[in-house]
Amino acid sequence: MTNMRKNHPLMKIVNHAFIDLPAPSNISSWWNFGSLIGLCLIMQILTGLFLAMHYTSDTTTAFSSVTHICRDVNYGWLIRYLHANGASMFFICLFLHVGRGIYYGSYTMVETWNIGVVLLLTVMATAFMGYVLPWGQMSFWGATVITNLLSAIPYIGTTLVEWIWGGFSVDKATLTRFFAFHFILPFIITALVMVHLLFLHETGSNNPSGLNSDADKIPFHPYYTVKDLLGVFLLLVTLMILVLFFPDILGDPDNYTPANPLNTPAHIKPEWYFLFAYAILRSIPNKLGGVLALILSILILSILPLLHTSKHRAMTFRPLTQFMYWLLVADLLVLTWIGGQPVEYPFIIIGQLASIMYFATIVIFMPIASMIEDNMLKFT
């Protein structure tokens, strides 16, 4: 069996990636989220596949087909809510994974990090298109508002929007193509995940100290496979509590009303995991400026390696930068709250201040804090 594991062309790849992989001996539970994201992806693909068997991507029957899944299909309600709440768990794991990467300086592995940023953008695009499929009020108006943002692009904006819509408004053609993209993108994400892992295994994992751990490695199996299983158990328990007791807590009540182009909801908002970006978008009165800020709120992650000014890799021994980091986390929570509030005083000004703080903390405060810490080391 050992020979087969080490010599068989396919088994050899699995062995080097998950069994005999040399891993740092001190990585904490914050390193569990990579495997949990993988689990979420597998779960979303499987539940999505079963939903696609019963869903119809037609404006007249889409809403009814989702109702049919919940009422008539065996355990259809379970599959549907696993898929919807699984997306929330996916994003919780993603945000924690990115947060860990920023805290421990994992962005210094530039190729792995940049593939990760591309993955985050792709997952966000997939989730947005998935939200449109049930064809409720928030699905329709969310799709209309977000796709309409592309009209801010000079010269080609309006043509581009109509090309994406497949007509002069969000309609049957839009729903059909969104379903097609929502189906194919998870497989593209899976391919990107493999590239992400390929680059990660070129350099090896980072660790909480931020120091080189080549002198102290342990095999991935059984140590980290067992450790990951605990994370898997906790994730599944949390998800099942969410699905079985509070299935609609993260959804919008408006999405239980069929889409009506003649009736605009009082407050159009995306799913909770996009609210921070939505708040940044709304904080700028200019349409093009808002769109650029929205895109930059994610793309700013890709310039983190350039903004790293410290001699230390991780924030473990950098209290000043740690303070700035937790300020950024608090700011993101404020932005998430603001994104769900109506556009009125005092929420407008809070959103604008929080948006300025978001970019300023990443681009100005954290690099300056790192430089101050480096200078303080000279006096010790």
UniProtKB/Swiss-Prot annotation:
Cofactor note: Binds 2 heme b groups non-covalently.
Membrane topology (UniProt): Multi-pass membrane protein
GO molecular function terms attached to this record: metal ion binding; ubiquinol-cytochrome-c reductase activity
A Pfam family: Cytochrom_B_C
Keywords, in A-Z order: Electron transport, Heme, Iron, Membrane, Metal-binding, Mitochondrion, Mitochondrion inner membrane, Respiratory chain, Transmembrane, Transmembrane helix, Transport, Ubiquinone
Single biological process term from Gene Ontology: mitochondrial electron transport, ubiquinol to cytochrome c
GO cellular component terms, semicolon-separated: mitochondrial inner membrane; respiratory chain complex III
Residues at which a ubiquinone binds: H201
Protein location: Mitochondrion inner membrane
Membrane-spanning residues: 33-53, 77-98, 113-133, 178-198, 226-246, 288-308, 320-340, 347-367
Necessary cofactors: heme b
List of residues binding heme b b566: H97, H196
Entry binding sites for heme b b562: H83, H182
Assembly and interaction partners: The cytochrome bc1 complex contains 11 subunits: 3 respiratory subunits (MT-CYB, CYC1 and UQCRFS1), 2 core proteins (UQCRC1 and UQCRC2) and 6 low-molecular weight proteins (UQCRH/QCR6, UQCRB/QCR7, UQCRQ/QCR8, UQCR10/QCR9, UQCR11/QCR10 and a cleavage product of UQCRFS1). This cytochrome bc1 complex then forms a dimer.
Other noteworthy facts: Heme 1 (or BL or b562) is low-potential and absorbs at about 562 nm, and heme 2 (or BH or b566) is high-potential and absorbs at about 566 nm.
Protein family according to the UniProt entry: Belongs to the cytochrome b family.
Function: Component of the ubiquinol-cytochrome c reductase complex (complex III or cytochrome b-c1 complex) that is part of the mitochondrial respiratory chain. The b-c1 complex mediates electron transfer from ubiquinol to cytochrome c. Contributes to the generation of a proton gradient across the mitochondrial membrane that is then used for ATP synthesis.
Protein name: Cytochrome b
Organism from which the protein derives: Phodopus campbelli (Campbell's dwarf Russian hamster)
